[in-house]
């Protein structure tokens, strides 16, 4: 996939978001989504979210990406959307539009490997370019069909 690069900027954490999570981040960024940066993968694996408090946040159309350096890759992430029927997204290309430039700059690498630590788990090849990001990975077709208009 080739998607637009969204450069994240430093931000402050909304009060409801701070109250909704069990670990406070070491860095807060914002592009379309909030990006909460942590110091290790274990915190991303064990993040707990109070859904009642989390759903008070209005960041439509965005969500919240939790990220840290990875044990076996360049970075890991998880992605949650408040007020959504799908609380945690399995593999989120749109959040990587901001995660890739952040980690590329921080690690001083153009090509990165990312793992999204959802229940399904997604392993992505990532690359930051001037105005866009490239995302690759393995996928399986689960549905084929035709639409007649």
Question: What residue spans do the PLM features occupy?
Answer:
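Active-site proximal loop and beta-alpha junction motif in alpha/beta enzyme cores
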Residues: 1-149
């Amino acid at each position: 996939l080739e998607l637009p690069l969204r450069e994240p900027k430093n931000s402050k954490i909304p009060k409801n978001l701070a109250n909704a999570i069990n670990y406070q981040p070491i860095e807060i960024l914002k592009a379309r989504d909030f990006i909460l940066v942590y110091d290790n993968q274990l915190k991303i694996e064990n993040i707990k979210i109070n859904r009642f408090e989390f759903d008070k946040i209005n960041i439509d159309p965005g969500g919240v990406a939790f990220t840290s350096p990875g044990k076996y890759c360049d970075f890991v992430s998880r992605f949650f959307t408040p007020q959504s029927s799908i609380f945690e997204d399995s593999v989120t290309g749109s959040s990587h539009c901001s995660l890739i430039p952040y980690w590329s700059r921080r690690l001083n690498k153009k090509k990165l490997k990312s793992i999204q630590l959802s229940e399904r788990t997604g392993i992505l090849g990532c690359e930051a370019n001037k105005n866009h990001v490239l995302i690759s990975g393995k996928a399986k077709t689960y549905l084929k069909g035709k639409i007649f208009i």
